[in-house]
Amino acid sequence: MDFKRVKGVALVLSASALWGASGSLTKILKLHGFSITDILSWRYFIGLGGLIAFSRMLSEPPALHIDGPRFRTALFMAVCIFGTNAAFTWSNFFTTVANAIALSFTAPLFAAGLAWIFLGETVRILHQVAIGVGFFGAYFVFGAYRAAETHTALSPNIPLGNGLALLSGLLFGWYIVVARRFAQRDGKVVVGTIWQFLILTVLLSPLMILTLFKRITGIGYLYLTVYSTLCTAAPILMLNLSGLFLKAHETSILALSEVPFSIVIGMILVGEFPPAATWWGVALILVAGFLGSMRQD
């Protein structure tokens, strides 16, 4: 058994489970009075604190100093993940949780093409099938919701939300490719991730002040802390670490598992129950994840 590969698969699945809760928590944060700018500015500051605390608990805490080339890579990754998170978070203000997840996870198609162009990765037949099955499954989920979609207070503009979710899929596919290249070339993944969050914290810090003037309850900030650490910092770090063990297109296929996670969590937290046909799409996505976890060299 290839234990490094098992570790990579476990990292992506864990990240998907945590990220799967982000859509539902975004809607909860909206109900507590947070705007898109509030969420995007505070999530990286709070997440940065969590990452630094985690790094200090390691047996050999890494030095946080980085040189120029590593900083430029961290800056580029920060811009990519900010675009991904901004588009996805905003999409959850307008469309359903499942629509946002399903359309954002066109990422394997983009990741496969970009990895082939920039990393020279060959997507062999079994993984080609996995990408096709996963994409069809995500589209099936989207189609099932579209047939039964209704505009609600939590999903007021479904077409706009769907477009933003599709944009996040493109950006996420690109981010996975960049993260894989950084992990393979440098290896200092924890430090690179901390710098991603530090860069975004500095850039977005002026917006944080505006949040303090809002009458948001303590429970709202508690939800924001959970969202920032467990649904932002932790999955991004796990995704970056998976680049040490998996190819970019493999990571993106396995990340499709976020769809069933998000649907189940959405049912529990915000009461969004999917149409029955949705579960056929979920089944296809699970098949794609199984095929994607198989080694193809």
Task: Give a label for each model feature.
Residues W42, A100-T106, V178-L200, T232-I268:
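Helix-helix packing/entry segments at the starts of transmembrane helices
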Residues K7-A15, W42, P62-A87, L160-S168, ...:
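Loop-to-transmembrane-helix transition segments
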Residues L51, L114, V123-R146, L204, ...:
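Hydrophobic transmembrane alpha-helices of multi-pass small-molecule transport proteins
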Residues F34-G83, F110, L170-V178, T193-T211, ...:
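Transmembrane alpha-helices of multi-pass small-molecule transport proteins
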Residues D38-G49, I81, T89-T122, A248-M267:
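Specific alpha-helical transmembrane segments that line the substrate/conduction pathway
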Residues A21-G23, I52-N99, S104, F140, ...:
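Specific transmembrane alpha-helical segments of multi-pass solute transporters/efflux pumps
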Residues M1, Y44, G220, A248, ...:
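C-terminal-most transmembrane helix of multi-pass membrane proteins
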Residues M1-W42, V79, A87, E149-R181, ...:
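Glycine-/small-residue-enriched transmembrane alpha-helix faces in small-molecule transporters
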